[in-house]
Amino acid sequence: MKTIAGCFFGTCALLVAIDAVAQTLPPANSFMGPPGTATMHANAASSNATTNRGPGAGAVSITGTSFDAVFPTILMGSDGMIVSVATKWTDRTPYVYLLNPATLEPLATMRLFKSAISDMAGGIYSYLDNDNRLVLVNAEGDLERISYSQQSSGTWSLNVESTVSIGYPDVVGLVPDYQGRVWFATAQGTSGTSGAVVGYYDPATNRTSAYTLPAGEQVANSISSSPSGVAVASTSALYLFQSGSSGPVQLWRDAYDRGPARKPGQLSWGTGATPAFFGPNTGYEYLTITDNAYPQENILVYNTTSGSLIGSVPFLISGTNSGNEDAAIAVGNSVYYPVTTAISIPSRRRAAPAFPHRRRSWGACSGSTCCLTAGG
């Protein structure tokens, strides 16, 4: 019997520093930059847990710089330089920023193509590779590796080092697998009725292979990888894929309760969680997401190998309406999720209508805790 503790709070840090001796993290992906800082969710497995030290509980000195943009993606390479993908408040155009790690002042910027359908497409879910290059798929469907350099004059520049057309625009999820293939998921299908596309580009063969999800299924979060495969959460189901001789192979699929509609504070009609691998032994024997059940969402924990649901528990034990638009912090036997119900966020273009429509109909969630015991 394995015990998985799920703790849910009204506010939650995006990353948790852990005791490296006591807990097991997913194995580092050699095609990605430093664990903890090379991607939005800490590592290829999206566990949001790192051995890096936090600020501590004492007084800290804070340095800030104002921008007319929102910065969801802030990454740091092995050289300590900060690379970020930000979206302008005015027109939602994405930009790459190279930031001074001491002052946070911009050293160089690069404008990216803006997606016509999703603010999450076009580079928001990007990562640093093992050469400190930013890897993204722009809104035109080009897989780019962007490096930075300093000239003799002291000025810095961002440079597109390589470009490969993968043929699929509006990519929202991006992650390398443990053999170096770059996996992606599109926001929606290539036609009005087809599902989103999951695929990968293989640098060894210079080929792109793809798999189309069932009709109507979209992807609104990033994707994750471990030695067992690549996890994708659509607006209807959780999947695990591996590469095959002719392209992506679906190992398993499990549909979850997506509820009657999109909830206020969430980007899509479906799960708000990027799948997270975790576990006490290998660091990836479990997978977790939340569903979109009404009124209470549930934390779901799956066996990575079989795809069987080994545990489910309501998001809050009080019966309060609940919602989540964030990946888990998952490590060992513990899972942490933030409650984001009715948080004011810019409405996603082409998002499904939200229900209930009035934010005040949702209760405030703070300090509630629940625990889950799962057999396995």
Where are the model-predicted features located?
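Asp-box/WD-like beta-propeller blade repeats and closely related beta-sheet repeat scaffolds
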Residues: 117-122, 140-142, 147-179, 185-189, ...
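Beta-propeller blade signature
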Residues: 197-202, 299-306, 352-371
